[in-house]
Amino acid sequence: MEVGLSMVPRVDAFLLGAPKSGTTWLAEALTQHPGICVSEPKEPNMVATHKGTFPRDDSRPDWSAYSTCFATDGVRIDCSVHALACPLAPHRVAENWPAARFVICLREPVSRTISHWNMIRDTGEDVDNGSDWSDFAQAWSDPRLQCDTLYG
């Protein structure tokens, strides 16, 4: 499909999941197969408006930039896990890649949520985005953590 002056790249599959559910491990394992091209970076975040736990961006994807995320032909897999929780992603995928396949990684939600919360605190992502998740109850009241925890 052509959008403006740039072509939407071929993508065969999407690896989706909540943060801390094993997607990085699986993406790394998939890179070992010579017939698979995992997106580089792992999470180009072009299809979803969710650009991680905090940032959101509703602008149209830059298909030219997205094309550079796939270095080889093979089975192309976009590993932008946040597309699972993004309400716009299903429409974009259906419109541009109607035959795409999906691999979805899930994890028991309580330990996954605590692991995600700890990661956000360890990286300072909460503070960098104007939030204070130092207390779990306060973090849980933030709909962004709930969105990732409840799988969208």
Q: What is each of the regions a protein language model found here?
A:
Residues 1-84, 95-105, 110-148:
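PAPS-dependent sulfotransferase catalytic core
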Residues 152:
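Long, charge-dense, solvent-exposed interaction surfaces that engage phosphate-rich ligands
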Residues 89-92:
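A short acidic, amphipathic alpha-helical/loop segment
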